[in-house]
């Protein structure tokens, strides 16, 4: 008889967003006259179609698959070089230097923020903001890791800060935060980087909503902070930036500077460990998707996406009457 991972007994039977979707569906079926009045606070899907340049790129990539000279089969697990360079160029336009070799392309930030836990022992202490994206808690609960919560409240502007009395090995930060939208400024992020460096911790930084930052003084990447490449992994996605919720594209930055000492005294690179994990368990994001995503990261592509983002930002007022 197999021995089961009994940590699954400690997670709820249904994932939060799946449960919200189920309840909404039941309500729609029982109240069809009110279905169009529902304000959905679940997974937060997009409603606008993919942009013109992305659709054109998808057609180009599909057509290339019909010609033997341009057909693409298995690709590199880390992602095609052209796509990783496009991402690095996007970082550069925002004043941040990221080595394309540190970028790993995947099918969603959900996958990577969940799978990254495989690099860390289950006896780590994990620090998680509350409220935040539920994947962080569920995946670490499934692993059996100890979770400590740091409360985001109105008093701290929903941006919890380091507490020197708390020792954490793994720190999750999400900025802009899902679901509050609160964003850390440079001084606040520096405090977190300093804390991580002092305590030999790793920050898992989710920047999936970075394109929604309108204040130019706010950092769109943790790598805007000196020392971050020695203590932080960054996750980002095109789900909300470019409407890729159904198309699926994300990227994770694991700097080569990110090294820790194993219990046997060996120095291990998280970059090399993640590369080994991905090459074993992931066959790469489809070429067609990467080709289209690379178009997003051009100046023209981002300008088109920004129009959609401005539309979504204009809808924020809808939630105002529901706030306490």
What does each model-found stretch correspond to?
Residues 225-310:
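Conserved core segment of the aminotransferase class I/II
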Residues 43-48, 79, 110, 133-134, ...:
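Short, solvent-exposed loop/turn segments at secondary-structure junctions
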Residues 3-107, 115, 296-302:
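N-terminal small-domain helix-loop-helix segment of the aminotransferase-like
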Residues 314-324:
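Residue-level detector of conserved catalytic or cofactor/ligand-binding positions
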Residues 30-32, 96-97, 223-227, 267:
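Short, conserved catalytic or adaptor-binding loops enriched in Gly and charged residues
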Residues 68-196, 210-225:
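Conserved core of the PLP fold type I
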